[in-house]
Amino acid sequence: DISEFGGNPSGHSLNDVFKRLEYCSKPLVAAINGITLGGGLETALCCNYRIASKQAFVGLPEVNLGLLPGGGGTQRLPRLTGPSEALKMMLTGAHVSAKKALDMGIVDLLSENVVEDSIAFAKEKALKDSKHPMVRDLNDKMIEARGSENVLVEAQAIAAKSRKGQFAPGQIIKCVEAAINLDDFDEGLKKEGEYFLECLMHPQREAMIHIFFGERSASKISDVPKDTPTMDIKKAGIIGSGTMGGGIAMCFANAGIPVHIIDQDEDNLKRGLSVIEKNYDFMVGRGRMTSEQKDMVFGLISSSLDYKDLHDVDIAIEAVYENLDLKLDIFKSLDEHVQENAILASNTSGLDVDAIAAVTKRPEKVVGTHFFSPANIMRLLEVVRGEHTSHETLATVMSTSKKIKKAAVVSLNAPGFIGNRMLFNYTAQANMLLLEGALPHQIDQAIESFGLNMGPFRMMDLVGLDLGWRARQLSGVESPLHAKIGDHLCDNDRFGQKNGKGYYNYSEGSRAPNPAPENEEVYEKISS
């Protein structure tokens, strides 16, 4: 039980139980059905044989909790798959399909009737064989890996890229290194126990488990009953084909949900669709999808210039820039053209959702859905609950967020909601450091060395400096000192990655940030 990590252990140790299983005189067959992760898979690895249903998935995802597989997983899995594949599986926390698990050597057979076949298999082995294989004795792949540093170097590269700043990945690598180099399996288990205890005592473990439970509790809304009916979102509509609109459209298409984009400007629409296709081409080039998959997913996205073409969508999401008057006009048009039972959502990052709902005849169907840029990559989704938003609307959006692989958090209708209220002070302090003489790459490097994937200036360039700039222009209020940097950059056509120059410069076709010394004069001028 994850909630028990860090508590006082009681009873028999897991490894004592597993050792009894391994040395049982009768053949043990693990019948794997559904999703078998962590200790479940480690239990199966102690059995002599493993039979899985074709729909099963297995994995050792403890790294996601700041831990390592502490029930012998780091010692047994490499003996079946080889250390390289085991390390990839444990460092990524990936869930592996039954078919792939068979190919990797984790399971012995696949079955349509896993329980019946496992019982029959155990009886057959009991009658035929007196000795049964124990994973702990399979040393060939360990001996083969000795003397070669390639496996461990490759694992360290994976950890550095995908788990930057995390403690547990290094411990997992040390465990597998012990499995490779130690002749005594039980000595390897002792090393695993030592490294597991270090993970258990590390503050990252407590923080990552907090995140694990936090994400799950965020999806539960105390005053919305679990049995609240939800709509089936079969088709989505997006208003706006810019950075946000295109990214949101990709979220739905990636989930297999047809999506229709409309825009007032034909050139903008063509440009937006071109960006979407380039994003998919980039994924094909990186091996994240095949050309056939790209054609199928991109084929789910249609477009036009007319609100009437949204008549059959189940949810319409407005994704234009932050101008309340413009959004009010859009919602009036949506209310007129979209079917009566459809949800109307706004991707506003901080405007009044109740004011938007008030111009419609269905305020109970209006909700804020604040995606973070780039919407097709960032997991967080703020679901903004208006005064009249119904339980059904809220439950439907929360359910749909899981389908499009978002971690949804419900926010009340307050200025800036949750995320932007936090980011405001974060980016303000970053800009103040510029005015004190630090440079963007120095600040970003400091933040990234602490463990964040991206520093504040890389983040702002990715999101687009023009978003905040337009909002400040519309507010009519003079920008605070720290925001004048962004204003000046935008006044000089520096919007970030989208046009190749912001706090950094970007080469054509590249997202790698390069220093922009021409900006230093701006920082000095504003600070004086």
Mark where each language-model region is.
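Active-site-proximal alpha-helical scaffold in enzymes
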Residues: G40-T43, C47-Y49
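Acidic/glycine-enriched connector segments
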Residues: I2, V17-Y23, T43
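Conserved catalytic cysteine-centered active-site region
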Residues: F18-A30, G34
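N-terminal glycine-rich phosphate-binding loop for ADP-containing cofactors
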Residues: F5, P9-S13, C24, T36, ...
